[in-house]
Amino acid sequence: MPQEQYTHHRSTMPGSVGPQVYKVGIYGWRKRCLYFFVLLLMILILVNLAMTIWILKVMNFTIDGMGNLRITEKGLKLEGDSEFLQPLYAKEIQSRPGNALYFKSARNVTVNILNDQTKVLTQLITGPKAVEAYGKKFEVKTVSGKLLFSADNNEVVVGAERLRVLGAEGTVFPKSIETPNVRADPFKELRLESPTRSLVMEAPKGVEINAEAGNMEATCRTELRLESKDGEIKLDAAKIRLPRLPHGSYTPTGTRQKVFEICVCANGRLFLSQAGAGSTCQINTSVCL
């Protein structure tokens, strides 16, 4: 520091000496320390400025945003791949027009829908082994809004025109099912089977079994029973064959058993008539009326 000298004039008195000079300033080790701290401060300022410029360059700070992050009037815009290390809260997430939106994770991706009390209402978890959805109801719809699939605690609804099962073992229903139509693919067989229990088909207005281009077989191990409680059973075909009917043998003696013969009316109705020495169908023609 510049050295300042101040001259102090004492009052003129007899026997007084001349004027005295007093030095005011910083000298010695104090002066060197001051210069050192000033130099250190300048170095820190330069380093701080250089680090700031480097960070701005690396993070790609611009007027519009930082790096792949752009601030627009509608919100934030991210370009390229982005990684979030903490939970992300957003009202809407959409991709660039014409591009797909991808969610990638090393473990799983979880989407939670919360209420005002931060309680989870619905949850979707996609993991490496399964996709799980939690909620009161699950629906799948087309672009036009038509229901394709719906599931809740009460029922599962399939709204597609056709439900196809491609598994080799078919479909197993442990409970009853309701459907207006069961059919196989063209040139494929339709098989309804109950390996250990009975198979029951019921309908309030009738059950129709139709094979348009092939045969229809009903096979059982013990008894095959066709019963109509209030109506009749029709066998409408040009030929009706019963090839395995048992043949009776003539026994002139012994207990007489009741034997009947099968009679056919002109309209195709069948009835039984007590057998005699000759045909007795003409006697009981009142059944054909």
Swiss-Prot record:
Q: Which UniProt keywords apply?
A: Cardiomyopathy, Cell membrane, Cytoplasm, Cytoskeleton, Disease variant, Disulfide bond, Glycoprotein, Limb-girdle muscular dystrophy, Membrane, Signal-anchor, Transmembrane, Transmembrane helix
Q: Which organism is it from?
A: Homo sapiens
In Swiss-Prot or TrEMBL terms, this protein is called Delta-sarcoglycan
| Role of this protein | Component of the sarcoglycan complex, a subcomplex of the dystrophin-glycoprotein complex which forms a link between the F-actin cytoskeleton and the extracellular matrix.
Q: Where found in the cell?
A: Cell membrane, Sarcolemma; Cytoplasm, Cytoskeleton
What is the recorded post-translational modification?
A: Glycosylated.
Membrane topology summary: Single-pass type II membrane protein
Q: Name one Pfam family in it.
A: Sarcoglycan_1
What is the disorder linked to it? Muscular dystrophy, limb-girdle, autosomal recessive 6: An autosomal recessive degenerative myopathy initially affecting the proximal limb girdle musculature. Muscle from patients shows a complete loss of delta-sarcoglycan as well as of the others components of the sarcoglycan complex. Cardiomyopathy, dilated, 1L: A disorder characterized by ventricular dilation and impaired systolic function, resulting in congestive heart failure and arrhythmia. Patients are at risk of premature death.
Q: Which residues are glycosylated?
A: N60, N108, N284
